[in-house]
């Protein structure tokens, strides 16, 4: 996030999350390492962000893997108004109640009409939905766009999806009247940053971060 010009702070303590949200311009709720304590913090943070009209992004990491995660995400979506859900196809399927075979935090396997399901979820929860994969998909429930590009090596690095969610939160925090276009630009830049000729995962991760910084500098 620092590479793209954002200034992050990570907080999951119940006694401070509302204060942290109060001085923030966006909130990312990521359930990657969730437990009962952090689940309470997520709810408090989301409610405070809604109160202050601060944009919120949900990254439902591995939501289809366990009933605990599914129930938590359902509760979050019921009680918090999100601006964006950023997920992979498997996570989208779990949120929508579609049949899918999850594989940890990875997308897993299954067959759904991503565009149709994503648009339904977008309308149901009144937020943008981004589904990432070989081709990224974004919708506001009415408009939709596919973004291609990038390299398969990105799928071999843990955290690239979580990083994208954080950058999307920064994009929403930047304001502007056309949030959909801002998010589309973010997705295109992210794909472009992943278009490298490196063959090794370690080299790819390093060059990926360098490229993100370069793109951020160009857009200043």
Describe these PLM feature segments:
Residues 186, 190-220:
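Charged C-terminal helix
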């Amino acid at each position: 996030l620092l590479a793209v010009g954002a200034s992050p702070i990570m907080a999951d303590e119940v006694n401070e999350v509302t204060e942290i949200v109060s001085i923030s311009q966006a909130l990312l709720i990521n359930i990657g390492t969730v437990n009962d304590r952090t689940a309470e913090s997520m709810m408090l943070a989301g409610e405070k962000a809604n109160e202050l009209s601060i944009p919120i992004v949900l990254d439902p990491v591995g939501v289809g893997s366990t009933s605990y995660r599914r129930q938590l995400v359902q509760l979050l979506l019921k009680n918090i108004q999100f601006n964006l859900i950023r997920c992979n196809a498997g996570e989208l399927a779990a949120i929508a109640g579609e049949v899918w075979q999850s594989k940890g935090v990875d997308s897993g396997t299954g067959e759904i009409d991503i565009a149709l399901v994503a648009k339904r979820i977008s309308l149901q929860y009144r937020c943008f939905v981004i589904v990432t994969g070989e081709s990224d998909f974004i919708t506001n429930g009415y408009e939709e766009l596919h973004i291609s590009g990038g390299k398969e090596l990105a799928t071999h690095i843990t955290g690239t999806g979580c990083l994208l969610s954080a950058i999307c939160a920064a994009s929403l925090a930047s304001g502007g009247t056309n949030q959909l276009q801002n998010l589309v630009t973010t997705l295109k830049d992210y794909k472009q940053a992943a278009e490298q000729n490196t063959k090794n995962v370690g080299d790819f991760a390093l060059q990926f971060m360098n490229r993100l910084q370069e793109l951020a500098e160009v857009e200043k």
